[in-house]
């Protein structure tokens, strides 16, 4: 077998393929865009993280408390005109709370109480082998929250959390909104007149890359990203990409070389991929280039 060298590969962005779409997280992670590579999905093929081709093709859909808290902070901080936190409603914690949420949705679709609970438990993975025995307990522990949610009205997309998770998210939001360094990054103004600089939130960007081996077409790779926030200052010719991270550990640990989240979750790889994709989009959309700005 001949030796394969990385230098024989060439990765070329297809600028005509770059597109920006407005979509929900649910759509972004749906099967419709499953052929696109994302930074988070790459871990499923990394053998050092237990990845494999099979796992990459059929990635698990994880839903944890940490992810729910992170999503709530992202949505309420970056899109306050669209999202809001519901007040405390004594929502059950962990999977039971998710079951009640799913039951609520299914009941609005016309499911009977029995079928809604069964379907919700199967979807969430909550006592799937003994659902009938758990139904009285589910109703007893979840009814107060279910009824309060039923009576709640809002014109925004509402995020319902357990009381303890609500406290965490509220604290994060209050801290971020009170931090001038953070708010100035998310909502920048120009230094001369104080006018707002173009700022965008939760943009989904897509691009194709042509990969050649020894100058022959090898494969076309499709990449996607969801930009938390990015700004473009047309006068100063500066593009800024901001990515919001939430952590339950001391902030000083984030960049630690061995155990920090930056290394553990490959955020350096994400930073490289996201900044490149955003740059190609701006190059195609605004005609910018690195030499002239």
Show where each model-derived region lies.
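Metal-dependent nuclease catalytic cores that hydrolyze phosphodiester bonds in DNA/RNA
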Residues: 2-224
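Mg2+/Mn2+-dependent nuclease catalytic core
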Residues: 202-293
């Amino acid at each position: 077998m001949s030796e394969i060298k990385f230098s024989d590969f060439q990765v070329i962005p297809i600028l005509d393929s770059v597109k920006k779409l407005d979509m929900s997280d649910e759509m972004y992670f749906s099967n419709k865009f499953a052929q696109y590579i994302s930074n988070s999905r790459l871990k499923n093929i990394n053998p050092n993280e237990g990845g494999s081709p099979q796992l990459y093709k059929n990635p698990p859909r994880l839903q944890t408390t940490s992810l729910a808290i992170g999503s709530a902070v992202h949505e309420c901080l970056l899109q306050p005109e669209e999202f809001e936190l519901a007040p405390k409603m004594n929502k059950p914690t962990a999977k039971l709370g998710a079951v009640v949420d799913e039951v609520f949705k299914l009941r609005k679709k016309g499911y009977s109480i029995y079928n809604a609970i069964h379907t919700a438990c199967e979807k969430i993975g909550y006592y799937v082998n003994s659902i009938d025995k758990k139904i009285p307990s589910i109703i007893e522990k979840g009814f107060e929250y279910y009824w309060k949610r039923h009576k709640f009205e809002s014109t925004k997309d509402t995020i319902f959390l357990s009381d303890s998770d609500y406290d965490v998210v509220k604290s994060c939001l209050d801290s971020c909104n009170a931090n001038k360094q953070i708010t100035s990054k998310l909502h920048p103004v120009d230094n001369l007149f104080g006018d707002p600089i173009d700022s965008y939130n939760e943009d989904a960007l897509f691009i194709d890359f042509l990969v050649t081996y020894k100058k022959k077409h090898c494969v076309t790779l499709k990449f996607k990203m969801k930009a938390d926030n990015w700004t473009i200052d047309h006068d100063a010719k500066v593009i800024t990409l901001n990515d919001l991270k939430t952590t339950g550990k001391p902030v000083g640990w984030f960049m630690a070389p061995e155990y920090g989240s930056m290394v553990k979750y490959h955020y350096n790889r994400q930073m490289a991929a996201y900044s490149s994709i955003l740059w190609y989009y701006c190059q195609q959309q605004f005609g910018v280039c690195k030499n002239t700005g």
